[in-house]
UniProtKB/Swiss-Prot annotation:
InterPro entries hit by this protein: LysR_subst-bd (IPR005119), Tscrpt_reg_HTH_LysR (IPR000847), WH-like_DNA-bd_sf (IPR036388), WH_DNA-bd_sf (IPR036390)
CDD domains: PBP2_CrgA_like_5
Name assigned to this protein: Putative transcriptional regulator
Keywords annotated in UniProt: DNA-binding, Transcription, Transcription regulation
Organism annotation: Pseudomonas aeruginosa (strain ATCC 15692 / DSM 22644 / CIP 104116 / JCM 14847 / LMG 12228 / 1C / PRS 101 / PAO1)
Length: 306
C-alpha cells in the first residue's frame, strides 16, 4: 500500500508541475493511460479531486496545490540525496540544469563545456533558453547566467566572461532615411527594436551612462522580440535601431552591415556570471561545470580598460 501511494504521489507531482499528462508521462517513462490511472486511483483513495483537466492543460485544484506544496520539495530532496549518492561512483555523473540566453549559450557555454562533456560521458547539461529573470530555486535549476549587475546578492556569482559593452546599431539603409541619434533621448523619435522580458512581460529599458550621468530610455518601435538573434536579423534588415551587448553585433559591424552610434554612452560593465544558491555540498558534476566555465581576467586589466 505504501509503495503504491508513493508511486501515485510521484505521478501526481509530475503532472501538477508539467501541466500536461504528455510531458509528465515522458518524464516518468510511463504511458499516459498508466499515468491517468495512477492519478485516478490516488484521487479515489483520498476521496478528493486533485487535478482540474481541460482539453489543453491540467492544473491542481486547491487541494492539489496544498498536496503539491507539502510533498513536492520532499521528493526533490530525495532526488538530490540520490544524486549525491551516485556522485560517489568513480566518475562524476548527473544532470546540471542551466538557464541562460541563446547567444551566450552558443558562443560561450557550449564551447567551454565541450571538452568536459567529451571527457565525462556521464555528465549531462540541460540548457533552458530564457531571457527573463528566472527564479532558479523555485524552477529547480542548478544555475543561471546573467550580466553581473543583475544578480541577487544572496547568490554565489562566478565570472564566466570578460566585461562587456552595450551597442546601439542600425543598418546603413536605416540611417540613410533617418538622422543618427546624438544622445540617448533622441531614440524616442526613432523606430527601435524592443525585447520583452519572458518572466515579467515588460520591455527592457535601454540604459546608458556617460561619466557620472545615467540615462534610462523607454523606446518604442514596430517590432518586439523575446530573443536576441531576431533583434540582430531585424536590424540587418533595416527595420530599426537595436541595443544589445556589442559582441552580438560584432561581425556585422566589422563588415559594415551595421553602423554604431552613441558609442560614448556605452561604457564597459561587469560581464556574464554563472550564479547559483549557496549550497553546502555541490555535486562533483556541478563543480566540474563551474570550473570549466570560470573566467580569469588577464593580469593587469580592469573593467574600465585593458
Amino acid at each position: 500500500m505504501i509503495k503504491r501511494n508513493l508511486n501515485d504521489l510521484l505521478s501526481f507531482v509530475a503532472v501538477a508541475r508539467e501541466g500536461t499528462f504528455t510531458r509528465a508521462a515522458a518524464q516518468l517513462g510511463v504511458t499516459q493511460s498508466a499515468l491517468s490511472q495512477s492519478i485516478s486511483g490516488l484521487e479515489a483513495r483520498l476521496q478528493i479531486r486533485l487535478l482540474t483537466r481541460t482539453t489543453r492543460s491540467v492544473s491542481p485544484t486547491a487541494a492539489g496545490e496544498r498536496l503539491l506544496n507539502a510533498i513536492g520539495n520532499r521528493f526533490d530532496e530525495i532526488e538530490a540525496e540520490l544524486d549525491e549518492l551516485s556522485a560517489l561512483r568513480d566518475k562524476p555523473s548527473g544532470t546540471v540544469r542551466i538557464t541562460c540566453g541563446d547567444h551566450i549559450q552558443r558562443t560561450l557555454l557550449l564551447p567551454r563545456l565541450t571538452p568536459l562533456l567529451l571527457e565525462y560521458p556521464d555528465i549531462k547539461v540541460e540548457f533552458d533558453i530564457n531571457y527573463g529573470f528566472r527564479d532558479i530555486v523555485a524552477d529547480r535549476f542548478d544555475a543561471g547566467v546573467r550580466l553581473g549587475d543583475t544578480i541577487d546578492k544572496d547568490m554565489i556569482a562566478v565570472p564566466i566572461g570578460p566585461p562587456v559593452r552595450m551597442a546601439v546599431v542600425a543598418a546603413p539603409a536605416y540611417f540613410a532615411a533617418h538622422p543618427k541619434p546624438r544622445s540617448p533621448r533622441d531614440l524616442v523619435d526613432h523606430n527601435c527594436i524592443n525585447m520583452r522580458m519572458q518572466s515579467g512581460g515588460g520591455l527592457y529599458a535601454w540604459d546608458f551612462q556617460r561619466k557620472d550621468r545615467h540615462v534610462n530610455v523607454r523606446v518604442d518601435g514596430q517590432l518586439i522580440f523575446n530573443t536576441s538573434p531576431n533583434i540582430v536579423d531585424a536590424a540587418l534588415a533595416g527595420l530599426g535601431i537595436a541595443w544589445l551587448p556589442e559582441e552580438e553585433f560584432a561581425p556585422h559591424i566589422e563588415e559594415g552591415r551595421l553602423l554604431r552610434v552613441l558609442e560614448n554612452w556605452c561604457p564597459l560593465f561587469p560581464g556574464y556570471y554563472l550564479y547559483y544558491p549557496n549550497r553546502r555540498q555541490p555535486s562533483p558534476a556541478f563543480s566540474l561545470v563551474v570550473d570549466a566555465l570560470r573566467y580569469t581576467r588577464p593580469r593587469g586589466t580592469t573593467i574600465g580598460g585593458g
